[in-house]
């Protein structure tokens, strides 16, 4: 099975810089991204789920505690678009 292609948005790049400034352990984020890249799924510990409302086409998972990752996922074309990362208050 082929792995997913990872694309990132400008917002994700900005959010990543904020996470770096906060001293968050980015290796945790990179582990989640690598797992998603392999087959588009995550272990239950990350509580991955689809969002609703304005975010109906997006997925969210908990990297650690209140640190979230939001992405779009196209399973037909094997593409993941990393949209944003941060706390609930940062993102919603």
Locations of regions flagged by a protein language model:
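A short, surface-exposed loop/turn module that caps and links secondary-structure elements
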Residues: 34-62
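Enriched for short, Lys/Arg-rich terminal
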Residues: 1-5, 11-27, 31, 52, ...
